[in-house]
């Protein structure tokens, strides 16, 4: 991938969602919701504070994160893959 996010932006790729229930039933519609887990592909240099210093991001490339899938999420196709460009503020947790 040849893209670098700016400031506190993070590029993530959504994890695949299981489309079958534990009993083998194929899930469709609202039962097959999009995953809010993703792999971090790239991170910006950090948030610029009021005093001009840069605060590095808490997430790093390779982290698996849980994110808020709402306002502020921008989907793009890069190298044929759909990725999301979000602010670090939209990341709720790092999965360890």
UniProtKB/Swiss-Prot annotation:
GO terms for cellular component: cytoplasm. SUPFAM superfamilies: GroES-like. The keyword Signal does not apply. GO terms for biological process: chaperone cofactor-dependent protein refolding. CDD domains: cpn10. GO terms for molecular function: ATP binding; metal ion binding; protein folding chaperone; protein-folding chaperone binding; unfolded protein binding. It is found in: Cytoplasm. Together with the chaperonin GroEL, plays an essential role in assisting protein folding. The GroEL-GroES system forms a nano-cage that allows encapsulation of the non-native substrate proteins and provides a physical environment optimized to promote and accelerate protein folding. GroES binds to the apical surface of the GroEL ring, thereby capping the opening of the GroEL channel. Belongs to the GroES chaperonin family. This is Co-chaperonin GroES. The gene is groES.
